Amino acid sequence: MAFKIIASQCTQCGACEFECPSNAIELKGEKYVIDPKKCTECKGVFEIQQCASVCPMPKTCVPA
Amino acid sequence: MDSATWEKIKDHPCFSEEAHHYFARMHVAVAPACNIQCNYCNRKYDCANESRPGVVSEKLTPDQALRKVVAVANEVPQLSVLGIAGPGDACYDWNKTRATFERVASEIPDIKLCISTNGLALPEHVDKLAEMNVSHVTITINMVDPAVGEKIYPWIFYGHRRYTGVDAAKILHEQQMLGLEMLTARGILTKINSVMIPGVNDLHLIEVNKWVKERGAFLHNVMPLISDPAHGTSFGLTGQRGPNALELKALHDRLEGGAKLMRHCRQCRADAVGLLGTDRGQEFTLDHVPLEPHYDGAKRQAYREVVARIRDDHLEAKEKAIATVASANIRGSLQVAVATKGGGRINEHFGHAKEFQVYEASQTGIKFVGHRKVEPYCHGGWGEDAALAGIIAALDGIDIVLCARIGDCPKERLMEAGIRATDTYGYDYIEAAISALHATEFGTAPSQATA
């Protein structure tokens, strides 16, 4: 499983990028994208998914 | 004020009301990520015409920021301060803040570095801020009671998790106080920004003022909430209103005697460029900036020499004017609105003014009390009636308007609304003109000093 970012709602603040413990998030062109191969949903590292937890926009960083 | 403190603030427009007539700041939007949510903030929308903290048109990488700072430094001689003030938090988005400051400081060593932060991640970076010679820090503190904070902050992100409610506000409060104390201990000047939210924290800000004064805050800036449904902020959508100019002034007056107040804030955008009250940001968007500008400090150097020469003259005239008004010992007070482009003089045309600076002449002397934003009366050479109606409304409570030039038509319309306007004192120093005006008004000119 992985998380994804709903690009139309994303403000591109980039907080998720530097909170992600797996380096799974990067800015590709005009949007932030989560690499599903790298995303671990923070299992074993943090109790709560860091990207969704830090995201300022409701329902923008969600389970894929 | 001791001379060491004066040295620190004399060319920082935000930390010194006097300096803001001469010096300019620029903000670079390199730190878009934020670790808290505030009910008055929404980072999703931008409009070039909107003057609102947190709003920017383009986010920059540290390299792009360096390009922009060099280009502005070459063109804007008044530039003295580089700030990072959002749209996110300069301490949370730390790597970008640090990289930007390091690059700019090596290129332009004499520029003052300044950040604005919510304080949550501040304590962990105070030592590095001191090491990088960041001389001025602004912390936004809206409460010292988490029960009040809960109404302003829906959540914070701290220690890898999201906190809500009173828990969130309590952590934020503790970090803010700790950060402020740490900065004071290192001799870094702090300004506290507070957003006045009627019915939520307005009277509570009296308590905030006491707390921050005790912890060494240099300046307290109480700003009105900007709230409009079109901005899409939580407060905008729930109909929470901002205070009007008179409510804000009443709170400012109650805070007199506590931590020193900042009254000349313009609540500028997080990518503003230029003197306070003007924003030249649109002239310096990335597509207007050379790819590899080379820093040329000649204009800034020449300007500083001019300011050093004229400043003492201005200060002397100002002090004399204030003393004259105070010694006249008149009970009544005079509310004066001034159109100015800077330099401490009445040098803006009425029709071109985007704001009026408000001064009060009273028994205590001449005091700057704030400013009123307006839509300029003249668009492309002729006046617009709708704009004039807006200006008259914005000048509520003003006795006299001073400007460099004014036409007969707007002058008459102002008079009908009970506001006098004159260009008699055009290009004079502001305080000297107000002093002369005060003497005429109350009949205390030396030749007829009977009152």
Swiss-Prot record, chain A:
Question: Which Gene3D superfamilies does this entry report, sorted A to Z?
Answer: 3.30.70.20
Pfam family, any one: Fer4_7
| Domain 4Fe-4S ferredoxin-type: residue ranges | 2-30
GO molecular function terms attached to this record? 4 iron, 4 sulfur cluster binding; metal ion binding
GO BP, one annotated term: nitrogen fixation
Keywords of the record, alphabetical order, are: 4Fe-4S, Electron transport, Iron, Iron-sulfur, Metal-binding, Nitrogen fixation, Plasmid, Repeat, Transport
Chain sites annotated for binding [4Fe-4S] cluster 1: 10, 13, 16, 55
Enumerate the residues binding [4Fe-4S] cluster 2: 20, 39, 42, 51
For activity, the cofactor(s) needed are: [4Fe-4S] cluster
InterPro entries given in the database record: 4Fe4S_Fe-S-bd, 4Fe4S_Fe_S_CS
Copy out the cofactor comment: Binds 2 [4Fe-4S] clusters.
Protein name from the UniProt record = Ferredoxin-like protein in nif region
Originating organism: Sinorhizobium fredii (strain NBRC 101917 / NGR234)
